[in-house]
C-alpha cells in the first residue's frame, strides 16, 4: 500500500504515528511489532512526536514497540536490517540522509512496512513517506523578524545545507523581505541535527557579528 501524508494527516499531534499504522492490515501473528529508528535523541521535538505516539500505543497494548535513538546515518542501514531480521512488522524513522539506501532495504524486505520521513516519493508497495510543512510558519516568523528588526540583519542556524533545511530558510527570508526588502541574512550550519551547545555558540557568533 502506497501512502503519502500531508501536514494534516501526519506531522502534528501525538496521534500521527498511530494514524499511519491504521493504514496497514492487522497481522495474523498478533500485535504489530514496530521499530523506531531515530538519528537524534527522542527529546528532539521532531522525533518526539513520533516516539511519544508510538510509546503511548505500546502502553495501551496496541503494538509492541522498540527503538534506537542517536543513530548516525552511517550506521542507519545496519540498524534497519537488524530490526528487519529480528521480526518486526514495521519500521518508522527518517531517511533524509539515506533515501536510496533505505529504499534498497525495503526492496530486500518486502513483507515489512516502512514509514519514513523523506522528501521523495513512496517506493514499491511497502515504503511510505511523510514530511512536514513548517516552511509556512517560517514565513510568518520572517514577517515578524522583518518588521521588528532595527538593523535589517537577520541570522539563521541550521543543521545541514540540504533542501529540507534550506526551504525553511528561504521561507523565512521571503517573509522578512515582504516586510523589509533591505534585510540581509547570515546563515550558519552546525553539521548536526541535535547539538544545543553548538547551535547556541553559532547564534552568539552571529549576534557578535552584528
Q: Which residues make up each language-model segment?
A:
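N-terminal secretory signal peptides and thylakoid transit peptides that target proteins
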Residues: 2-18
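C-terminal segment of N-terminal export signals and the immediately downstream linker at the start
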Residues: 3, 24-37
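Extracytoplasmic "Venus flytrap"
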Residues: 33-60, 66-76, 96, 161-167
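Structural motif
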Residues: 65-84, 191-207
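Periplasmic-binding protein-like
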Residues: 88-95, 115-117, 210
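A short helix->loop->beta-strand "cap" motif at the edges of active sites that frequently abuts
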Residues: 110-112
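Short beta-strand elements at the ligand-binding edges of bilobed clamshell
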Residues: 122-147, 156-164
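Extracellular/periplasmic Venus flytrap/periplasmic-binding protein
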Residues: 166-210
Amino acid at each position: 500500500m502506497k501512502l503519502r501524508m500531508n501536514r494534516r494527516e501526519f506531522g502534528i499531534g501525538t496521534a500521527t504515528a498511530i494514524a499511519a499504522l491504521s493504514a496497514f492490515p492487522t497481522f495474523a501473528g498478533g500485535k504489530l511489532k514496530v521499530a523506531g529508528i531515530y538519528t537524534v535523541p527522542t527529546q528532539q521535538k521532531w522525533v518526539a512526536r513520533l516516539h511519544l505516539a508510538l510509546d503511548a500505543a505500546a502502553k495501551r497494548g496496541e503494538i509492541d514497540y522498540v527503538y534506537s535513538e542517536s543513530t548516525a546515518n552511517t550506521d542507519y542501514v545496519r540498524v534497519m536490517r537488524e530490526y528487519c531480521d529480528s521480526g518486526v512488522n514495521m519500521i518508522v524513522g527518517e531517511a533524509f540522509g539515506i533515501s536510496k539506501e533505505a529504499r534498497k532495504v525495503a526492496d530486500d524486505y518486502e513483507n515489512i512496512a516502512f514509514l519514513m520521513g523523506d522528501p521523495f516519493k513512496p517506493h514499491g508497495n511497502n515504503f511510505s513517506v511523510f514530511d512536514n510543512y513548517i516552511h509556512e510558519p517560517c514565513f510568518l516568523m520572517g514577517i515578524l523578524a522583518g518588521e521588528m528588526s532595527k538593523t535589517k540583519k537577520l541570522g539563521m542556524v541550521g543543521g545541514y545545507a540540504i533542501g529540507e533545511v534550506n526551504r525553511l530558510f528561504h521561507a523565512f527570508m521571503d517573509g522578512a523581505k515582504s516586510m523589509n526588502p533591505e534585510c540581509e541574512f547570515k546563515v550558519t550550519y552546525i553539521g548536526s541535527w541535535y547539538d544545543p551547545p553548538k547551535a547556541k555558540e553559532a547564534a552568539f557568533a552571529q549576534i557578535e557579528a552584528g
